[in-house]
Amino acid sequence: MDIFSIVKKKLKRKVVVSIAIKEYSMSRDSTRQLSPSFRVREFGCKGSDVVLLDEELVVLLQCIREHFGKPVHITSGYRTAAHNAAVGGSKSSQHLLGRAADFYVEGVDVATVAAYAETLLPSRGGIGRYPKDAKHPKRSTGWVHIDTRANKSRWTL
């Protein structure tokens, strides 16, 4: 049984999963398949060959993809400190560690995606909701942030 299958089973049983963060190279590994739906290049950062990535994050996103049966588009994965600062990210962002992704599911609203993510991470991890709404009319789409931090954090912006 591969690591993806093992972690997915543990997540379904609500078992705390601990996986090491791996380092990839965009020049060498960009097309490497991480799960049935995701490749290294989807988590890359502009201007960086290095991609740090927590395998559990990939499993969470694959579970979301399978649950909705629709494409999951990652808009931000790993970030270098320079890129994180340029996009206004928190100095303690989980993106800097390869433990976070911002994404949207084609044709599914932010609240529905976040509610399902909550079933995967009921007592830990970060889940942020960034809806496209009257308060945020300039957003081209809404998105969800998910991360694998040890403590539980939830927010809506």
Language-model features and meaning:
Residues K8, K12, V51, S92, ...:
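Catalytic cores and adjacent binding grooves of peptidoglycan-active enzymes
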Residues L53-L60, K70, H83, R99, ...:
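Amphipathic alpha-helical interface surfaces
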Residues S25, F38, A82, V87, ...:
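Solvent-exposed, flexible loop/coil residues
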Residues E55-L57, A82-V87, T119-G126:
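Short amphipathic alpha-helical surface micro-motifs
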Residues M1-H67, R139, R149-L157:
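Extracytoplasmic cell-surface/polysaccharide-interacting catalytic and binding patches
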Residues V58-G88:
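Extended, low-complexity, intrinsically disordered C-terminal regulatory tails
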